[in-house]
Amino acid sequence: LMALRILRDEVLHSARTPFRYNTGRVLIQIMKEIIRSRQDELTQLKLVHDFRKVTSGNPRLVRQFLNTYHLLEMPEEWNQLTVDHHVHDANTKGRKNATHLIMDAWIKGIRYITVVYYNYVEPAAARELLQAAEIMGVDVRIGLEFRTPFRDRFVCFVWAPRGFSDPEAFLSFLAERPMVALMNEGRKASLWMQRHVMDTLQLWNAKHAPALAEELEIPVPLLEPEAFLAYVGTGQTSFLHLAEYAHKTLLKHLVQRVKALQEEALTATSERQSQIAQLIRRMDMLTTEVIMETWLKPERNPELPSPDVPDNAPDTPELLRMPPHVLLDWLSCLRSGYRITLQLAELTAEDVLELLWDCQGMITHLELFNLKEWQEGHLRHLTAINDLQIAINKGSVLHLKQILRGMIRTLEASSSEKDKERCAKFRIILRNIPSLQAPYKVAPLRIRIGTDSTSHSGVRHGMGLAMPETLPHGARRQI
């Protein structure tokens, strides 16, 4: 943290230029590149030369380097509307520690950020994050993501307590007895998920690794549980970590096998060359994402209990058995100031309406856009959900009745017993629309947008979303 403070002061005040914020962003980015190139002295020398040129603060030169590093120019008044209300650091499934995450957010020009932790947050992690954000002038919130059973699956909420004057006030809140009790329950939920991941690791060793070794004609090392947990480190064990670790252990053998095949292809028959080319393509495609989708996702392993399906077994933590309204009532009692955001992945407008009704105004925000979920095709009902949100906020009884009657007609046409039960519930809501609207007359149902970035995958966009109208003309033209 001290190094971060010194770094910010140096880059903002070393250049005698009115273009100091953008100059500082480029200087830190070049420093990162110098560190990454520590094994390549020639590249480092070139980067040091670039660094010296940028310290002049020449706007034309700085803009060139912004473009080189895929950074948008930000206004020197530093009043841009740039946000990301859903990112992860290394204490969950992200790659960067809290200090690194905040530094990168500043480089990207992000002013408002919410870092999401699963089930609990360690005080040391919260302290580092909040102090780093204070140093860099980034407005940060800490959100805790909880999963709760709803109609044979889990829905996710992000609870972000607010109203703290400084980092110490938030840390004092974490030390209060009710919060300690919640964090302890959260740790149980995370350990429950870890057991599911470790069971999948054992299945990989017993089933998937031998099959993959036979297919690719390479040795596929078995994964050691202790080594895997050491690889996860301070993070919370996840299927993403498992996929990355499996890929890491495979990579050396893949590279060696590809080299051997390329040498063999030089003297092979045309038929064998075709087989070799196909095998190399298969190896090239074996990314972390492919390993996850093909072998590690719960639906790919039906012989194991799925952590994505609610279970009332005695060993299931209480936190994962609470209905949504019970969990949210608990959270809302812990702090008078809070935001509770409903995540919309795989939810329909009917699901959202029912949750809003059940939770009686405790849901304050909808995560209307999540870049990761959108890329994966999990946000198919955003238009209908947005229409519902607008109708609730406008206070239009006629509009809400129209939406509800359309839902009821669809449910009436279904032969499912669950749809009939939901239809009866929606008729009750139809007769009590003012009760649905009442909590949102004072504080409208708002939205949150985020990327769900973990800084891991090269096939996904990084963190940060910007309102183009708040950016300089050159950046808008570039977009």
List PLM regions with ranges.
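Charged catalytic cores and adjacent phosphate/nucleic-acid-binding surfaces used
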Residues: 1-112, 121-182, 188, 261-265, ...
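Non-catalytic, alpha-helical, charged scaffold/linker segments
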Residues: 169-283
